[in-house]
Swiss-Prot record:
Name of the protein in question: Tumor protein D54
GO cellular component entries: cytoplasm; perinuclear region of cytoplasm
InterPro entries: TPD52
GO MF term (any one): protein homodimerization activity
Disulfide bonds: none
Lineage: Eukaryota, Metazoa, Chordata, Craniata, Vertebrata
Residues modified as N-acetylmethionine: 1
Amino acid sequence: MDSASQDINLNSPNKGVLSDFMTDVPVDPGVVHRTPAVEGLTEVEEEELRAELAKVEEEIVTLRQVLAAKERHCGELKRRLGLSTLGELKQNLSRSWHDVQGSTAYVKTSEKLGEWNEKVTQSDLYKKTQETLSQAGQKTSAALSTMGSAISRKLGDMSSYSIRHSISMPVMRNSATFKSFEDRVGTIKSKVVGGRENGSDTLPSSPGSGDQTLPDHAPF
């Protein structure tokens, strides 16, 4: 058996013999990271594009650092001015809403909604519904007006009755019947009062009683 094809068993006493015949092969670092050239580009164009890409990435890193510094400076200025986070949030929301209103999607949606609204308002169904609601509103207004007139008329009748009743009371008091009744009541009252003043507890005798007297003692 040739020595190059030695047993590679780990338990073999001849292990590692092949390592004596292996030598280090130098590798170009540029070959490791280099990818195959893009189709349609020469090596010179590829190198130029890679150089430009590295430059742009470096500029992006620089701009991020500048932006972070500017944001810190802006936050410090707001803190010194006493601007709250809520006010900043409102400004951001307002700015975002303004951006949304100016966006193409929002404009197209608004135009589409306007077209739909115009179509709906011009449709026969919408017009019939609007006419029906208008007629119902007119009937309701007329019914309320009639009810209000009836209530006002009823209140007017009650007021007129109260006024007539108030006016009729003095007229009734000045009538002959009312005066005759008052005279009779006054006569009876004066007789009762006069009898009590004379020490007599008996009521005045009625006409036609004569000289009849009551017995001294009751027959008990």
